[in-house]
A protein has these predicted regions:
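Glycine-focused motif/segment detector
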Residues: 1-197
Length: 197
């Protein structure tokens, strides 16, 4: 489907259908967490699913979590190379936010090295961050790695408009308490607003 087709399901004429879809999924997956955070997390999952889809069919999957996970696997199994333009734009974009890098208590927050690393880390962590290469290259979002003592990425952080909008560990898990404290410390030091984890 790709990012160009994401606008279609979010068109104003589809608003009621979209809200009904998300509310049904929210009650299915987040019965224990019916709050704005759960709603936002589900919307992000749906958006990511739509970005990774190659076709326009099944924009309202009956099981969003399974459909998202399958789309993620399919995305990483595609043998796509990045164009020279995307590669160069990506490299230029990440240089613009090197100032967000940070170290604390053995953890490191750093920029991705290149688009290939984005795809490789996303596949390893089983998260869809590899689908964000174009968004980083177009400077519409910033992705950083949360790394362990050996500089191995253990999570991905998304920053938009000076706000942390996502922090995902392997398999889309939320950070544990220790990691959450590192992220909060980083946000405070870099003057980022925590909009969501």
């Amino acid at each position: 489907m790709g990012i160009k087709h994401v606008e279609k399901p979010f068109a104003s004429t589809e608003f009621i259908k979209n809200i009904n879809y998300i509310l049904k999924r929210m009650f299915k997956y987040y019965e224990d967490r019916l709050d704005p955070e759960g709603f936002l997390s589900l919307l992000k999952m749906w958006r990511d699913y739509l970005i990774m889809k190659e076709d326009e069919e099944d924009i309202y999957p009956s099981n969003l979590k399974i459909a998202h996970d399958e789309a993620t696997k399919e995305f990483y199994n595609r043998n796509e190379d990045f164009s020279l333009d995307v590669y160069c734009n990506f490299k230029n974009a990440i240089k613009c936010y090197e100032y967000l890098e940070y170290e604390n208590n053995g953890y490191k927050i750093r920029i991705p090295r290149d688009p290939c690393e984005m795809k490789k880390v996303g596949k390893k962590l089983n998260i869809c961050v590899g689908a964000y290469v174009s968004s980083v290259a177009e400077k519409t979002t910033k992705i950083l790695w949360l790394c362990n003592r050996n500089d191995i990425p253990i999570g991905a952080l998304e920053v938009k408009d000076n706000q942390l909008v996502q922090a995902k560990m392997a398999n889309n898990h939320h950070p544990n308490y220790e990691v959450e404290q590192i992220i909060k410390s980083w946000c405070k030091k870099k003057e980022l607003i925590i909009a969501s984890f």
